Amino acid sequence: RTIIITGCGGLLGIEFIKVLLSKGHTVIGTEISDSKINKISEMIQDVNFSCLKCDVSSEKEVVSFFKHLSGLKNFPDTLINNASITSEYLKENDLEPLSFIETSYQSWQKCMDTNLGGVFLMSKEFVKLSQELAPKKAKKIINISSIYALHGPNPKLYEDTGIKSFAAYSASKAGVIGLTKWMAGFLAPYNFTCNSIAPGGVFNNHSKIFEQALSSMIPLERMANPNDISGTVSFLCSEESNYINGQVLYVDGGYSSR
């Protein structure tokens, strides 16, 4: 398959690229900055991988991105909507998430525009061009959501950890699930399947305090590793998942079962 991965330079995105390339797929990634593109291009040097600049919250950039892809011999048949503003993203860019009452509408909207609006814009253009260029081919859309879409975070988990949860993240990821289910029904007649993955907490150099606190809430007693999530992505990209549509796959070690 030829697969698009948005936000490919993040912790999960990099792992997705690696596992999909190992399965023989061609991967086209997107990132928002030249520095991230250069970093990921140095890290992953493979003839079947390329990375292009695209802000998924910008309709102009998304349209331009797909216009470029329309000239390819093999137009992509799979879209993985992975780009999002997370607590880790805010920390990396020295943008501390504010408390609920301190959050400005502008900050709220920026998160919504990326986490939910980006899924809409990318999916819309992907569907539009797929119907023009490969209407009979089976297509897949995989949206990365979160366990916090349907399970609110436990405030006690974040006490004395230095990590903050922010409302727009949970709300936007819940919207991703709603959009996934809508697309699954309405796009099925046009040879699309649409599914969502809801990862649990993925270890990313968290403090020992946070790791232990979260692990105690998970039946498997550990946080996820990136490859725990990438295996599910690989499965949804495979032919073995062709009859799965409109589903949310929780990859959380059993956290949501409690």
Task: Go through the PLM ranges and name each one.
Residues 65, 80, 122-126, 130, ...:
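Hydrophobic positions on the long internal alpha-helix
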Residues 97, 153, 216, 234, ...:
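Short C-terminal tail/terminal secondary-structure segment
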Residues 97-121, 142, 169, 176, ...:
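Catalytic Tyr-X3-Lys loop
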Residues 101-105, 136-137, 142-175, 180-189:
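Catalytic loop of short-chain dehydrogenase/reductase
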Residues 218-229, 240:
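A conserved structural motif in NAD(P)-dependent oxidoreductases
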Residues 82-96, 254:
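Conserved NAD(P)H cofactor-binding loop of Rossmann-fold oxidoreductase domains
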Residues 128, 185-186, 242:
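Alpha-helical segment proximal to the catalytic Tyr-Lys
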Residues 1-28, 183:
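Canonical Rossmann dinucleotide-binding motif of NAD(H)/NADP(H)-dependent dehydrogenases/reductases
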